[in-house]
């Protein structure tokens, strides 16, 4: 009989982003999260969306809840998952259109979801030394944690995936 996990709790949670309510139609559009919370319509929609998402998870009996990545803008194919930090890290300027080459190599055409995603994803250009920017992850987490007694987890893109969405014009390649 397996006894290694006999007394270990396996807490339940969701993975990935939660669908955005249709009435939540405002976005950060590159703004600071804290600044956006100062705008009454964004604040109301954001807080209502996070409360609804947390309540749904609690009603489902999940042990660890999430804000559903509600900070992300309405964008094609989850673009905001990459671009939330790209828009805020110092040293990144503008965008480079790499879509045509990528799409022709993979025989993609309009109407296919990967065409739409690739056309929307324009890598940010690293023009100078990358420096810390105002990601405000603590403030985003605190908003959600105030709405529940359960632990709140928080998702963010990992560094290797983020690097894959940047066009380097500053650092020497290895």
Question: What feature does the model see in each segment?
Answer:
Residues 1-174:
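Domain-level signal for soluble alpha/beta catalytic cores
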């Amino acid at each position: 009989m397996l006894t290694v996990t006999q007394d270990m709790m396996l807490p339940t949670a969701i993975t990935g982003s939660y669908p955005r309510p249709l009435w939540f139609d405002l976005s950060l559009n590159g703004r600071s999260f804290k600044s956006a919370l100062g705008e009454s319509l964004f604040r109301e929609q954001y807080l209502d969306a996070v409360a609804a998402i947390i309540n749904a998870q609690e009603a489902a009996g999940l042990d660890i809840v999430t804000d559903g990545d509600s900070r992300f803008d309405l964008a094609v194919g989850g673009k905001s998952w990459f671009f939330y930090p790209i828009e805020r890290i110092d040293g990144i300027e503008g965008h480079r259109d790499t879509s045509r080459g990528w799409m022709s190599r993979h025989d993609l055409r309009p109407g296919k979801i990967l065409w739409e995603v690739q056309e929307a994803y324009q890598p940010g250009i690293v023009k100078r030394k990358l420096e810390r920017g105002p990601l405000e992850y603590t403030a985003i987490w605190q908003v959600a944690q105030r709405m529940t007694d359960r632990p709140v987890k928080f998702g963010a893109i990992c560094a290797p995936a983020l690097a894959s969405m940047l066009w380097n014009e500053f650092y020497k390649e290895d």
